[in-house]
Amino acid sequence: MKQELVLILDFGGQYNQLIARRVREHNIYCEVVPYKITAEEIKLKNPKGLILTGGPSSVYGESTPRCEEEIFQLDIPILGICYGGQLMAHTLGGKVNRAKNREYGKTALQVDGNSKLFKEVAQDSICWMSHTDFIETAPAGFKITGTTADCPVAAMENQEKALYAVQFHPEVEHTEKGKEILKNFLYEVCHCQGDWTMENYIEKEIEAIRNLVGDRKVLCALSGGVDSSVAAVLVHQAIGDNLTCVFVDHGLLRKDEGDWVEDIFRNQFEMNFIRVNAEERFLGKLKGVTDPELKRKAIGELFIRVFEEEAQKIGDFDFLVQGTLYPDIIESGTETAAVIKSHHNVGGLPEDMKFQLIEPFKFLFKDEVRIAGLELGVPEEIVWRQPFPGPGLAVRVLGEITEEKLHIVREADAIVRDEIIKAGLHRQIWQYFAVLPNIMSVGVMGDERTYAHTIGIRAITSSDAMTADWARIPFEVLENMSRRIVNEVEGANRIVYDITSKPPSTVEWE
């Protein structure tokens, strides 16, 4: 029996990946595809439904993204969200106009409870709006099923043709009944059964890897992070000792992290595990480098070189495991994607290395990889690890990297993490760490003047890392961090707390 599928046509909206995650939460497999996908290609995939995403364009723009008009004639249920709804209205003969008052933020919504889309949804609720254009007149054959004070067509539908549109964003948490609305589209309109589970996904991946690899050899670049760790465990379950894991220790890890990774994978999982100590080479390469992008590129290039050297020592292998995630795939295929920071990944390996990639999680999101890890029996301390950048502490030490600065930020970071765990906040806070901003300040310790480094503490709350707010850590916990760092970490005499959200800031300082 073929697995149910929902296709999400990507028009460049900021919440597109969030839509996919919400669909998956309802146990339905979905894929994000470019808006240029043809009606014929859609028919071949045989989806249960289509979702047209939001986007920054206007339907009247010269180069505005449009899907094929034939898509609306396929007899496949369609939900248009924001721009996707405007495009549906415009294409089918409705009228879209520029709003006098742009709607942005939480908005009071009134809906028709007789609509399948709003089954068991309160008539009055709050939704999240983010638009400049709006649907002024619904196309012929459509019924208006939702309104706001400034939006006469906040929702519309042609029930006979299973075409639905909403001007608001049901995928974001600020829309009170957003999850229920999406669930209604998937189950009441598309008649999905909900046949997608992590257990089934893992079984299929293990079987596919086993059939692909056979008796051949596989190499895994293991960082100790969630993605590569869970990928290594899954592949190891599929092929056993035919997998060899290479762990490049670049000397930019958190306190005791290298030893911890080695113990987990060599001793607990009994994998073929090779640890390469390359600290001197990396610190030598970073000497005098202060620009954050140059630091990232230097680390990435040397990582590739070290990994390639080790691979040649091992001998012939046919496959390489990578912990690539679905957002990487989506962003690489999206015309509107922009590079904010270069990403450190083994994907930059030389083309002349003859191997085939195994990417078991290339269709999963981060939270789904964590679920997969728990299903596979991966220890919780790995599954719930803090996100950690590939360049490691090199991007948490601003300016030039030195052994002294690394030691200071490493010790301070260990204290921050320890105090968060002691306070029982480690599951509530998405990410927390110490930063050395390369700022010296005057202090007094005992009867002596000091001139030492400032340490920044960064802690954020988030559900998806696309947006984040600074964590309201209790003052007594912050006080404990500050007191311990100043007393226990030589070279630090001032502690500051970062209270900036994302946006405008990014999570990492570099």
UniProtKB/Swiss-Prot annotation:
GMPS ATP-PPase domain residues are 196-385
Q: What class of enzyme is it?
A: ligase
Q: Which UniProt keywords apply?
A: ATP-binding, Glutamine amidotransferase, GMP biosynthesis, Ligase, Nucleotide-binding, Purine biosynthesis
GO annotations of cellular component type? cytosol
Catalytic residues identified in the record: C82 (nucleophile), H169, E171
List, alphabetically, the InterPro entries matched: Class_I_gatase-like, GATASE, GMP_synth_C, GMP_synth_GATase, GMP_synthase, GMPS_ATP_PPase_dom, Rossmann-like_a/b/a_fold
The Glutamine amidotransferase type-1 domain, residue ranges = 5-195
Q: Give the reactions, separated by semicolons, that this protein catalyses.
A: XMP + L-glutamine + ATP + H2O = GMP + L-glutamate + AMP + diphosphate + 2 H(+)
**Residue positions binding ATP:** S223, G224, G225, V226, D227, S228, S229
On assembly, the entry states: Homodimer.
Q: What is this protein's name?
A: GMP synthase [glutamine-hydrolyzing]
State the species of origin: Alkaliphilus metalliredigens (strain QYMF)
User: Upper taxonomic classification of the species?
Assistant: Bacteria, Bacillati, Bacillota, Clostridia, Peptostreptococcales
